């Protein structure tokens, strides 16, 4: 790299951290760390109507939970919030006004709406038409005086070079260009309330903070020519741009929408459900990028080492909840028990299940969990009198030899003394039933498993029976015998 790498994640504090925004932050983070550059966070809080109390803290907290750190932010540097930089924006607005590259616009919302309606009826492309068009200097001065006397507060618009071509080589999509005449006319750079518009403030901030590369979602492609216009007007060199493809729902094939209620889309949701941050980090890193090869499980350090911006995908990234759950399960299985038990404690405590056997239950079901909150439904059988059965389980229990197996195994449990009721002694009792009845394989193990746990699959059967306890195991078998005799 010929210049210092400085990249940024610039969220608006308007709500929770969405998976798409988390990906933007993560790719900027990986790019900076891979190249030994600087990763900074800037808060874009000029949209006061959408500002959410505590939104900034929530964004930073969830980024930290994912495992990201940064070199510069509002926490360590002054004026890293746009609301703290209004004087800087005003400086450049005044400069553009003085140079005739921008002007004050007194057109009202009603006049703009009427013009848009006229254009629509005429079949014209909607655009702002300079209100001073055709006016002499005297007429222009009289118009401004009349508007100011009426108390109309002006906006400031950038004078667009309609014949200009605004192009860049995108890091992801290759060469892109826009004609100046196709962006809707002179556009507002300062609103009536004195706040800058998004595209103006972003360009000023990126230049002032010496941002070398702007990596963001492709919904920002249409913003780029406007930002290039600001760079051109102020005589600045623009950063490089890279626009990541959108994220689609793997089930619908459509753009991931916040209305897709079947998909968890906010990092806060994953935190609350007990996903491991390393798993979510790993999953997001592969949304629109991959290092090549078949492997999909990578540590943060491995992802930093492997990250190559040239492998950013030009095709939409599919958000697959099943893949995330598979990946999360892999991380939970391989995590140490202490970590998962600590994560499980709040769920167990809320459900009244933080007993002396709680840690053993977590150990038993850790290999099955996709998220730690699943410890509650997975352990229902230990805290209920009779497990609910599926149709497939009921069909198994209609087998001719089922009562024989259950009666024989119940007798074995009843004969065991408390000191002999330990995990390693339970399997021999099942084998003894096999020897006595001649029933083996699935016809032996499946009825016992379903009667005791209410499931056809699960942890090792002796472990389940031991943790359930001798009396409760006997009770479950008795309940099942009553059920199948009806």
From Swiss-Prot:
Localization per record: Cytoplasm
GO cellular component: cytosol
The keyword Nucleotide-binding is annotated on this UniProt entry: yes
Main location: cytoplasm
EC number: 6.1.1.17
Catalytic activity: tRNA(Glu) + L-glutamate + ATP = L-glutamyl-tRNA(Glu) + AMP + diphosphate
InterPro entries hit by this protein: aa-tRNA-synth_I_cd-bd, aa-tRNA-synth_I_codon-bd_sub2, aa-tRNA-synth_I_CS, aa_tRNA-synth_I_cd-bd_sf, Glu-tRNA-ligase_bac/mito, Glu/Gln-tRNA-synth, Glu/Gln-tRNA-synth_Ib_cat-dom, GluQ/Sye
Residue ranges of the motif 'KMSKS' region: 255-259
Single Gene Ontology MF annotation: tRNA binding
Binding site for ATP: 258
Spans traversing the lipid bilayer: none
Position of sequence motif 'HIGH' region: 11-21
Source superkingdom: Bacteria
Top EC group: ligase
Single GO BP term: glutamyl-tRNA aminoacylation
Entry keyword set: Aminoacyl-tRNA synthetase, ATP-binding, Cytoplasm, Ligase, Nucleotide-binding, Protein biosynthesis
Oligomeric form and interacting partners: Monomer.
HAMAP family: Glu_tRNA_synth_type1
Biological function: Catalyzes the attachment of glutamate to tRNA(Glu) in a two-step reaction: glutamate is first activated by ATP to form Glu-AMP and then transferred to the acceptor end of tRNA(Glu).
Protein family: Belongs to the class-I aminoacyl-tRNA synthetase family. Glutamate--tRNA ligase type 1 subfamily.
Protein name in UniProt: Glutamate--tRNA ligase
Organism: Streptococcus pneumoniae serotype 2 (strain D39 / NCTC 7466)
């Amino acid at each position: 790299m010929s210049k210092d790498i400085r990249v940024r994640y610039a969220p608006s504090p308007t709500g929770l951290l969405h998976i798409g925004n988390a990906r933007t932050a993560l790719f900027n983070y990986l790019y900076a760390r891979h190249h030994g550059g600087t990763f900074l966070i800037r808060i874009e809080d000029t949209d006061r109507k959408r500002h959410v109390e505590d939104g900034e803290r929530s964004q930073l907290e969830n980024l930290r939970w994912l495992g990201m750190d940064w070199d510069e932010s509002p926490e360590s540097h002054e004026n890293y919030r746009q609301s703290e930089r209004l004087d800087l924006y005003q400086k450049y607005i005044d400069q553009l006004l003085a140079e005739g590259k921008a002007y004050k616009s007194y057109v009202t919302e009603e006049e703009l709406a009427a013009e848009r309606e006229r254009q629509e009826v005429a079949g014209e492309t909607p655009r702002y038409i300079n209100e001073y068009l055709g006016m002499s200097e005297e007429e222009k001065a009289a118009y401004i005086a009349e508007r100011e006397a009426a108390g109309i507060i002006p906006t400031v618009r950038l004078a667009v070079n309609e014949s200009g071509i605004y192009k860049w080589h995108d890091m992801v999509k290759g060469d892109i260009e826009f004609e100046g005449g196709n962006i809707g006319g002179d556009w507002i750079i300062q609103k009536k309330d004195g706040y800058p518009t998004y595209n103006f403030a972003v360009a000023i901030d990126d230049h002032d903070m010496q941002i070398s590369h702007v990596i963001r979602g492709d919904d920002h492609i249409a913003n780029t020519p406007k930002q290039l216009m600001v760079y051109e007007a102020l005589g600045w060199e623009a950063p490089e741009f890279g626009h990541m493809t959108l994220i689609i729902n793997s089930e619908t094939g459509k753009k991931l929408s916040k209305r897709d209620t079947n998909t968890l889309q906010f990092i806060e949701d994953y935190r609350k459900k007990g996903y491991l941050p390393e798993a979510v980090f790993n999953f997001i890193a592969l949304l629109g990028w991959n290092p090549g090869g078949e492997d999909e499980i990578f540590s943060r350090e491995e992802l930093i080492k492997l990250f190559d911006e040239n492998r950013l995908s030009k095709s939409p990234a599919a958000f697959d909840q099943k893949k995330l759950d598979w990946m999360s399960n892999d991380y939970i299985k391989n995590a140490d028990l202490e970590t998962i038990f600590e994560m499980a404690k709040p769920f167990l405590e809320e459900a009244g299940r933080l007993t002396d056997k709680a840690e053993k239950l977590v150990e038993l079901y850790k290999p099955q969990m996709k998220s730690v909150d699943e410890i509650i439904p997975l352990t229902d059988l230990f805290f209920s009198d009779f497990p609910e059965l599926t149709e497939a389980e009921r069909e198994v229990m209609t087998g001719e030899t089922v009562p024989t197996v259950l009666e024989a195994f119940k007798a074995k449990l009843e004969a065991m003394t408390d000191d002999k009721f330990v995990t390693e002694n339970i399997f021999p009792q099942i084998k003894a039933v096999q020897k006595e009845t001649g029933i083996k394989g699935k016809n032996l193990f499946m009825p016992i498993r379903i009667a005791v746990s209410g499931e056809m699959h699960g942890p090792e059967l002796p472990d389940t029976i031991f943790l359930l306890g001798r009396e409760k195991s006997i009770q479950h078998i008795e309940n099942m015998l009553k059920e199948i005799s009806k």
